[in-house]
Amino acid sequence: MKHDESKNTFKHNNIRIAVVQVGLYFEKGGNTTDFFNDLIKFIDKNPDVDSIVFSENNVFSFKTPYNKELAEKLLQDIKNSNLQQKISFFLSFNGYKEFNNVVTLYIFKNNTHLNQKKALIPFIEKRGLFNRESNINSVYYQIYDSHVNKSFRVKDSSVSTFICYDALFPEVTKKNSEVILIQSNYRLLDKGFGHDKLKYLATYLARFLNGMQSKVIINIQNYGGTVVLYDNWRINNDIYEKSKNEPFIIVDLDIK
């Protein structure tokens, strides 16, 4: 992905991120049989990827037998490919094993960690106005108060993750990360006209609330329209337009 160097200070190939817009892949005719093979082909065509980041999605989940099978197959495919030895993964699951919340699953080498969604929509994502216990087979999720979300390192840069609307609520304990990844699914809010502006405004607000010290925010959208916002408040429109039609895209960053 080429950028106009006269307009920003970002160079190429410091951190290379492969963005996977899961919903758009299937909307464009992709299928569960070919999904991982298509991703591998994309990585082969775009060498030196440091991280692969999935959108929030409704495909990979442990809440139904069918989706659990897809989730377990994805994890096994990653393990068999051995990609996690050189590429860090930021996956997205609706529930993970018995952990009944929307999560980011970080995998790199022998390290794994779950970051959970901290802002659940009442009566839709959680049972009522307050946080209540729900098992993995429930249609609802729960927040685990004792679970600690953490930040990560990609090469020499710090990376924080948020899940969709989480990024619109200021964290009590700030993690000043250089890169913020937001795994989103705004499909329910897509009413046509104004949807592009909504994604822009949400990303600006996320930067204001949680990323004022960050170099870049990447708001990964499930059905396309991923927003890359730099520290000078400039959005990369080339990436945004490309991401509307291509499920897999590359974002090259220099965090120096």
Which residue stretches match the model-derived regions?
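Active-site regions of metal-assisted phosphoester/phosphodiester hydrolases
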Residues: T9-N13, I124-G128, F152, V179, ...
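Soluble catalytic regions of membrane-associated enzymes that act on cell-envelope
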Residues: H3-I121
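Short, conserved catalytic or adaptor-binding loops enriched in Gly and charged residues
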Residues: N8-K11, S81, S151-R153, F208-G211
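Active-site catalytic loop in hydrolytic enzyme cores
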Residues: N100-P170, K174, K244, I255
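A structural signal for well-ordered alpha-helical scaffolds and beta->alpha junctions
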Residues: F36, D145, K199-T203
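Residues that flank catalytic or metal-binding motifs in active/ligand-binding sites
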Residues: N13, N101, V148, N222-G224
